[in-house]
Amino acid sequence: MSFQVTVTWQGSPAPEGEFNRDHQIQFGSGQQVAASSAPEYKGNNELVNPEESLLAAISSCHMLTFLTIAHLKRLTVAQYVDNPVAEIGKKESGKIAITHIKLKPTVTFAEGIDVDRETLEKIHEKAHANCFIANSLADDTEVEIEF
């Protein structure tokens, strides 16, 4: 299995020594997202940036893995909301990187479905262990469960 996207940037007039960081990301499904660098790196704060995209990818992967595990356990999820945070810092090598990701999911189960904290933690642990995007990142990812 493989995935492909197309990232397109087109030069445009800019002050001497500057360049426009806005670009388009086209996904295999045909959907397009307007993107830029983060505002801290002279990007457009109205567009998605790579750091947010990475954070959304790991959050989405964890959620979908969690939902699969819950479904297999016949635990009907009514709502799942995550407000993840990514921290940028310097690695030991001196390179700037996303050094810590904290997922902060809140899960609401369907009426009549009671899940204790221990079971919820186990499902999140299993989801994290099986999320291939989390497994692809070398740095620290934490799951802080909102109960």
Give a label for each model feature.
Residues 61-62:
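Alpha-helical metal-binding/catalytic segments enriched in His/Glu/Asp
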